Amino acid sequence: TPQIAADGLSKMINRVGKFNYDSHTHSLPKKRLNAFMDWEHNGYLLSLITRYVDGYTNQRPITGLGASLGYKNKVDSFLVFDISARKSIDLNEGNINFGIAIINALDESAPRLYDAPDFSFDTRVHDPRGRLVNLNLEYNF
């Protein structure tokens, strides 16, 4: 991100790994990794999705109240597992699929962020919803 230096010239600032409360750029964790694995057998499909977001630094000073509530300048990393299963059954004129998905299967809480609205989480990086279960029924003809 360019910034104006004291001498009036612009310089580049590395904002990776930071919350970036003082610029137009949003949080930029150093690492974001997604891994996918599927297994299919006899009309069953099992899937595992792993999502990882690296921790990062919040440069804004924390007040006494924030410190007393346990906030710190390091936003923790976030690792989430999603699991899904589907069964496909062939019918005379089409097929029917039954499915279940568990998003955030281990019910991980989004890391707390001192600077967030209501002292909660970083809305641009983390999903706060916890475990979700999705049932699916689909008929194809």
Which sequence ranges carry the predicted segments?
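C-terminal beta-signal and adjacent terminal beta-strands/loops
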Residues: T50-T63, K87-F141
